[in-house]
Amino acid sequence: MDSNTLSSFQVDCFLWHVRKQVADQELGDAPFLDRLRRDQKSLKGRGSTLGLNIETATCVGKQIVERILKEESDETFKMTMASALASRYLTDMTIEEMSRDWFMLMPKQKVAGPLCVRMDQAITDKNIILKANFSVIFNRLETLTLLRAFTEEGAIVGEISPLPSLPGHTNEDVKNAIGILIGGLEWNDNTVRVSETLQRFAWRSSNENGGPPLTPTQKRKMAGTIRSEV
């Protein structure tokens, strides 16, 4: 197991524990509590996948955080917070690419939580890149404005967009939706890669082909999902 994967899980477990204490003292609002529930499910899934005990991981995560806070000076902390709290808007797509109308020969659509995934299943044997415009905070994807899948010729063949009726989504929601889109496109023998900007802020790491670290089993499952549930 990669050491960064382990330490990331341990710190996430401890930070969830801290947020749970905030919720127990009735200091969290509705979005805060909703994210807490979502992240609890995510941590349980990650713990099961990694074969790690959440309680033990939480204790180690506490030690990691305490060590970092002890080593960090007040001035460094202020500078880090000033930089991290400044939300940035990143753009893979031009205004023309975002606003362009597109059509599907074999339209498929799936609602994935608060996001809508659309794709053209008539597209086969193409090299496809996923581009997105989104905001970033704490060096993580915060809010997705729009994601589109483009062929090398510039044709739009897929899209992920927030549902107006379900405002608010998490980084995990976006990753799940991207997994569904990739799975559906790869089912038809297309080669899909993700833009460097999206890789950097949506995933901690990427595979050697420029895509998110999805296992073959995940891809087959996601492809089957979009074929059977749209």
Curated annotation (Swiss-Prot):
* A single GO BP: symbiont-mediated suppression of host cytoplasmic pattern recognition receptor signaling pathway via inhibition of RIG-I activity
Sequence segments annotated as region (Disordered): 205-230
Q: Per the database entry, which stretches of residues form a coiled coil?
A: none
Q: How is it modified after translation?
A: Upon interferon induction, ISGylated via host HERC5; this results in the impairment of NS1 interaction with RNA targets due to its inability to form homodimers and to interact with host EIF2AK2/PKR.
Region feature (RNA-binding and homodimerization) = 1-73
Query: According to the UniProt entry, where does the motif Nuclear localization signal sit in this chain?
Result: 34-38
What residue spans carry the region label CPSF4-binding?
180-215
What keywords are assigned to this protein? Eukaryotic host gene expression shutoff by virus, Host cytoplasm, Host gene expression shutoff by virus, Host mRNA suppression by virus, Host nucleus, Host-virus interaction, Inhibition of host innate immune response by virus, Inhibition of host interferon signaling pathway by virus, Inhibition of host PKR by virus, Inhibition of host pre-mRNA processing by virus, Inhibition of host RIG-I by virus, Inhibition of host RLR pathway by virus, Interferon antiviral system evasion, RNA-binding, Ubl conjugation, Viral immunoevasion
Residues spanned by motif Nuclear export signal:
137-146
GO CC terms in record: host cell cytoplasm; host cell nucleus
* Span list, region PABPN1-binding: 223-230
Top-rank taxon, per record:
Viruses
Pfam families, A to Z:
Flu_NS1 (PF00600)
The question of whether Ubl conjugation is a record keyword is answered with yes
Where's it found, cell-wise?
Answer: Host nucleus; Host cytoplasm
Q: Which Gene3D superfamilies match?
A: Influenza virus non-structural protein, effector domain, S15/NS1, RNA-binding
- Its Gene Ontology molecular function terms? protein serine/threonine kinase inhibitor activity; RNA binding
Q: List the disulfide bonds.
A: none
Function text: Inhibits post-transcriptional processing of cellular pre-mRNA, by binding and inhibiting two cellular proteins that are required for the 3'-end processing of cellular pre-mRNAs: the 30 kDa cleavage and polyadenylation specificity factor/CPSF4 and the poly(A)-binding protein 2/PABPN1. In turn, unprocessed 3' end pre-mRNAs accumulate in the host nucleus and are no longer exported to the cytoplasm. Cellular protein synthesis is thereby shut off very early after virus infection.
Instruction: Report the family membership.
Output: Belongs to the influenza A viruses NS1 family.
Subunit-structure text: Homodimer. Interacts with host TRIM25 (via coiled coil); this interaction specifically inhibits TRIM25 multimerization and TRIM25-mediated RIGI CARD ubiquitination. Interacts with human EIF2AK2/PKR, CPSF4, IVNS1ABP and PABPN1.
Q: Quote the HAMAP family the UniProt record gives.
A: INFV_NS1 (MF_04066)
Q: What is known of its domains?
A: The dsRNA-binding region is required for suppression of RNA silencing.
- Protein name, UniProt field: Non-structural protein 1
Supply the source organism's classification.
Viruses, Riboviria, Orthornavirae, Negarnaviricota, Polyploviricotina
